[in-house]
Amino acid sequence: MKILFGVQGTGNGHISRCRTLAKALKKAGADVDYILSGRDPKDYFDMQAFGNYRTFGGLSFATLNGKINFRKTIQRIRAFRLIKDVRDLDLSAYDCIISDFEPVSAWAAHHQNRECLGISNQSVCQYLKPKEYGTIANVIMKYYAPVTQPIGLHWFHFGHKLIPPMIDSFATPPTEDGKIIVYLPFEDLTEITELLSQFPQYQFSCFHPEIKQSSARGNILLQPLSRDNFTQALLSCSGIISNTGFALISEALSLGKKILTKPVAGQFEQVYNAQCLQSLDMATVMEHLNSMKLKYWLGLPSPKPTIYPDVATELANWIVSGQKETLLSLSQRLWSQTKFPSNVSERIKSLGYV
């Protein structure tokens, strides 16, 4: 099967998830071409899984001090370039089109009257229509990267045909060394370090795109972005402080790491993700960098891990086999293999789900 896979490049979480699915698709025998959009080509890293991928400008949201900056977002849109990229992308050689919230591949499929699978956390809004999004946000989420078959990834199904998160396997089992990982790429680095320095009895490993070389600042180890170094730190940490992107939170849940999360203000997906995590008793949420909330969270024990099945392999086989099984059946089968910690199971029951 020949597949075109469009990957949203603005967040490392999208790339991480698609990297996991890329390995599974290759193992399933698929021949896949990848396109990425939304980021300067020089800013991609650890991209071996995508082979000779192509890049496009696409669409992306600009942030400032942890909030969506709509003025800068509008300024960076190159509408004529996007339209040209969509019209020039020939899909005739492909049996299947997949988009992980990537607009060029999705709109090209729409323009050429092709079916398109939308595999992303954002596809959840096609089913749940979150009130946190509002009417305008739901319209944006629907038409940013339109697909014919939305496949929503989520931490729980909420009574819909969603599927669990795709999580890569780890080479070693998780441990706890007492350190706390901090990954808040959309927040001001100075504000982050000022907050962490108020807790000298704890050791923090802070990864941030502004950091170009490793260094120590009191109780804070400042580290540049590196997938391998971050993964090693995640496996051994005693907790993680992050924005509310789907992929990293999913990994932390599967490893049994306690989570303190701050959604990027104005980023609809993250605001809704935070609300879901709170309602499921899976994480602690703060709306802004908050020393009182951090102090409370540091005193919490580590949770038990959430055990999700090998979703990437199941999904890859489902795609390559021609999607003969219904999405509802696939969803039910995957959730039947999912095991939640007792506190989460109790919360799910209290919400009316069995």
Spans of features found by a protein language model:
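A short, glycine/small-residue-rich beta-strand->loop->alpha-helix junction that serves as a flexible
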Residues: V7-R19
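Donor-nucleotide binding loops and adjacent catalytic segments primarily
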Residues: A22, M166-G239
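A donor-sugar binding/catalytic signature common to diverse glycosyltransferases
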Residues: I97-P103, A108, A233-Y272
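Catalytic binding pocket for nucleotide-activated donors in carbohydrate/polymer assembly enzymes
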Residues: I249, L253-P303
